[in-house]
Amino acid sequence: SYIELLEIARDGKRSRDFELITMELFKNIYKINAIVLGGARKPDGVLYMPEFGVIVDTKAYADGYSKSIAQADEMIRYIEDNKRRDPSRNSTKWWEHFPTSIPANNFYFLWVSSVFVNKFHEQLSYTAQETQTVGAALSVEQLLLGADSVLKGNLTTKKFIDSFKNQEIVFAPSILHS
């Protein structure tokens, strides 16, 4: 069950499971096309509909995800790869998973992790500023609360994308004790 994401997100040894199950949840519950990529010089996955695309990076950390310029730079590279779409810059051509129908200004970035700590918000602003691209961070708890909202008919795909505001997404008040 998807609830196990709460534990997997805190287990660095299960990073791949975290990627796979997170993307499966987006596909099966949020009803957004999701492709798992991962590997060298590729984001962990992409989400897309005909009108938008999201570059996804998942991080499984026991103590939460804190600001890392190296990881911001990695996301910036993915965003730039997708903008330029130049195989001589990145021969993996991972961006070809996005449909050609997506307008150039309708791409987003997303980090998913157990929790976001310390100055993580600075990583979001820095990445957005460097790429002129809107992004977000989504904790596993909010990912699950969002899924519950989707199932109840309260969270549409449009509302999901509209919640990308270069900050952490909060669909509902936390029900976990930190």
PLM features: residue spans?
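Catalytic core segments in nucleotide and nucleic-acid processing enzymes
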Residues: S1-H177
